[in-house]
Amino acid sequence: MSHTKKPTIEKIILALLGLLALAALVRTMFLGLEIDEEYALSLGFRLVRGDRLFYSMWEPHQLAALPPALLIGLFTAVTGTTTGVLLFVRGAVLAVKLALAVWFYRSLRVALGGRCAYLLALAVLAFTPKWFLGPDYVSQQFHFTLAAFLFLYGYYAPGPRQYRGLWRVAAGGVCACLSFLAYPQTLAAAPVLMLALLLLGRGSADKCRGLWVFVLTCAVCGGAFVVYVLQGMGFDFAALLARADLILHDPQYDFTTADRLAMLRSKLSAVIGNCWLSALAGVALAAAGMLFGERRGFARSLEKALWYTAFFLSLWCTAYCLRAQELDFRYMCPAFALAGGWTFWCDRREAGHRPLRRLLFWLGWLPGIAAYLFILRSTLIALPTTFMYLFWPAVCGTAALLLKPRPTRRHRAAAALLAAGLLLACAVPRLCLVLETGWHCEPITAIQPERITRGPAAGTWADTKAADMQDACMKPSPPMRARACSRPSVSSTASAF
């Protein structure tokens, strides 16, 4: 093949992958309804209509109501109605995702190379934790975490603007606080981030300014939030503590560490059963490399086996989703995160690209792992479902492959294949499958989409069953009680609009 044809084919493939990611998101924007998305919007709408956090709202996820409330408030102020607000919110989230993906690409293009930065940016663009675009607490946590990383990376990254523009650190602190607010369990990442800023600024008083600005910003944001909540309760601090205690002791989260470990152990065999074939193939390829003359040592051979396993799992997850019609299948995320962590460890003493590796490790990978471990302890969801929280460490781990001391063409090609595998696992199932009511998926070719013309979901399409349910919800019904302690049903969620 001539040298002129090779770049042309590569550009065509990259363009097709970009179209795949966009097509998956556009499909998600216009087709499908999901109860968690409606629930997230109903929390925001309750703030718009006058309910107050911890006073007339009792849901455990109420802290994630502020961003949806801003979007819904803007929409209702302009239009005077909630008809079509779901499509507006989805469009706003899609615009934010596009901006973050472009920002990610521009920030890391020099460090990672244009091709791999582009593929990882597409993976970040295509990924939504719960398969819908609405800003629920998990989606907010991921996207605010990404924004915080990009702000902090812009301040600490080597280059002419390093340690300039403290506003970046302040903005990163605001985004980190919004991430913690949306999903309080991820607060475990805060001490890791503070330690990271301390280590990255070590050796100079000027460099340490970033840490103090970050801490001060977090303190101001925390204080402002407490004042906002208190003013809705008549500044009764004792009442706020009592309400918070009641919400934090929700019966559905009343389990011990031993109970949680038992739950996780019960799912471990299923995880191993779905991963062993890919792991065996990865080990076999790494062993074959050693047999045919590669003298890499145990640590490097294990690194190679882990990355082979991660790549095979990304392909397996994509194929399994289409075969079993299952959207919640992300075993590749812990594989990528684990392989990336091992790469960081193997390269810890290498001088080449060390500053960039430190940034990815301390600002991206390690805070993500810390947050995941605390989520793993504090949530009731099944072990495989928690893997969605490892997507960000998986992205950081893949980027670490390109920050080798002496990256070769093989390293760049391997990183590109891994990033493409991550992208396919995120985009293909969402493009080809549609989530139906009852957590069940159907191929997009098998459903009969029906356009919704009334209510908050107007302008979107859904399968006939979900559309009929949405239409039934728009019939007159009693308003949702402000003090409902349990999670609303589909009917009460829709009637809240």
Where do the model's predicted regions map?
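Short hydrophobic/aromatic helix or loop-helix immediately within or flanking a transmembrane segment
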Residues: L41-F45, S56-G84, S179
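Short periplasmic/luminal acceptor-recognition loop of GT-C membrane glycosyltransferases, typified by
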Residues: E59, A190, P429-F497
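Transmembrane-helix signature of polytopic, membrane-embedded enzymes
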Residues: A99-A126
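Short hydrophobic alpha-helices at membrane interfaces in multi-pass membrane enzymes
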Residues: C116, F151-L178, D206-L216, L360-L366
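Membrane-interface alpha helices of multi-pass inner-membrane proteins
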Residues: P129, G165-P184, A190-L195, A219-V220, ...
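Short acidic/glycine- and proline-prone juxtamembrane loop motifs at membrane-interface regions
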Residues: L133-F142
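Perimembrane helix-loop-helix junctions
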Residues: A157, A189-V226, L291-R296
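Membrane-lumen/periplasm interface segments of specific transmembrane helices
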Residues: L211-M290, L315-A319
